[in-house]
Amino acid sequence: MRKAKVLFKNEEAGILTQHDDGSFSFRYHDDWVANKSKQSISLTLPKTEKEFHSKYLFPFFYNMLPEGSNKQVVCKLNRIDREDYFGLLITTTRNDSIGAVTVRKMDNAQLIIDNG
């Protein structure tokens, strides 16, 4: 299982998870949902307490990935499998992306706290 923090305008909005079977889930943090001034990260992922599930990477996140020759270069330079969409996402959107959303890999200490 791999997890990443999803930030909206540099504030942590929720957690994106890739499960061992390759499926994905996304959940907003409770405090994000409770705060009326915070908006959804996407129209396709409306702000709610429920967890979203998908067999594939959610289209919102998939559309943040590089394509074509850019994808080839990024994968080669970072030694990422071309089919590893989660790895590609956290590599290419950790510092900068088009729009207000960035995605950052959670380190082992954060995973222990989150699962503890």
Regions found by a protein language model. Give the residues of each.
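Phosphate/dinucleotide-binding and metal-coordinating scaffold of catalytic cores
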Residues: 1-116
